[in-house]
Amino acid sequence: MDEKEFAKICKALGDENRVKILKMLTAGELCACRILEEFSITQSTLSHHMKILSDCNLVSVRKDGKWSYYSINCKTFSEFKNVISEISCEKNTKSECSCK
């Protein structure tokens, strides 16, 4: 995962509704209508949120006729988690500045 993809995911996660949607999807695949039941938003607003989550590959969408079913993309989350681990403070050690 490159920095651009990572930043795009961080931006997507910056909205509490999208975080709530992702938490709902941890239970498994859900129809858009089921997700919508949990929010006080319009269908078009939900579609906007789902497009953002889908565009950065956090969720996968499966179409069945007029219905859309969403699920978490575990591969993307695994890669995102790896990048978070790479920039963790746990590995931070003091080093001498070379410009002295």
Describe each model-derived feature in a short phrase.
Residues L46, L53, Y70:
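Divalent metal-coordination and catalytic microenvironments
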Residues K11, K20-K23, S54, S60, ...:
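A cross-family signal for key residues in well-ordered alpha-helices
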Residues D2-E5, C74-K100:
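Amphipathic alpha-helical dimerization/coiled-coil segments
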Residues D55-D64, S71:
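Beta-hairpin "wing" of winged helix-turn-helix
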Residues K23, S47-H49, K66:
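Base-recognition residues in the alpha-helical recognition helix of bacterial helix-turn-helix
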Residues E37, S54-D55:
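Alpha-helical residues within the helix-turn-helix
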Residues K4-K11, D15-T42, S68-T76:
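N-terminal helix-turn-helix DNA-binding core of bacterial DNA-binding proteins
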